[in-house]
Amino acid sequence: GTHAHTWSGDGQWISFTYNDYIMEQLSKTDSAVKDLRTIAAMMPGKVSVPDDGTMENNNGEYFSAVVARVTENPAPGTDEIDKAFDEGWIGSKGYQKADGSWQHRAIAFQGNVRNEKNETIAEVFVTDIPDDITKVSPGGHLEGTAHTRPDLPAGVVQRRITRTPEGIHGPRHWLRTTSDGALILFMAKDSKNIIQVFSVSPNGGSIKQITFNDFSIQGPLNISPDDQYVSYIADNSVFITGIQTHTSERLTSRSTDKEAPFGAVIWSNNGQALAFNRRIIKEEKPYIQIFLLKQ
């Protein structure tokens, strides 16, 4: 099935994580097959399917295809992955490639690789997506077969972006990008073993540290609409950090562990407000509430 659907910057496409039901069923009888999570996308385009009476097969307004390649047993030290997850669209209109041309649709995601020690670590990946995902390379099957998972559409290019000793770390988070597509933000450990925010270009290259806090980040990150700040929870408080200045600002006083904010800190569309969750203790019971910070 599909999970965690996200609109593209132009509001036309949708990305999501995907597990193939046929492969999941096959894995119960074939030990060589595993139920692997991957990334897929939907584009506008009517789809008609036969009605089999189960109410499981329905006509639709969007066409879907898998856009990340996963494999059961990634070879150590390679770019092969056995899980693609926690993705985000790159930029509001894609990103500019090193040659100056524009890739109009692309997704950044976390991919689980095996390092030289055969340990699983997550790295940043990018998949470039063509304007039409209804076509497949010769010999391929977009829908998959009874024994193979769906193939990628023709023109999809998957690339590994980061090559780090320990990979992505920290609380679960979806990769975020600036609206111009120039930066992908993710979390990893710094030299002091503290979870910080880092950035990298979708074209690859050097990784830059964004936050320099004395404590680890506690939840997902989000970028302000003007691309100036990243918001997150840390030290039981709401924080923002300048992406270019690296200056961090505590926006709420430090809460107790029982009443600490948690989850993602969400920007309003105009960047003038932040929304977050925090527990309030009433009669010794915790109740999750929504809070707003307004400029």
Residue ranges and their predicted role:
Residues 1-295:
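Sequence signature of WD/YWTD-type beta-propeller architectures
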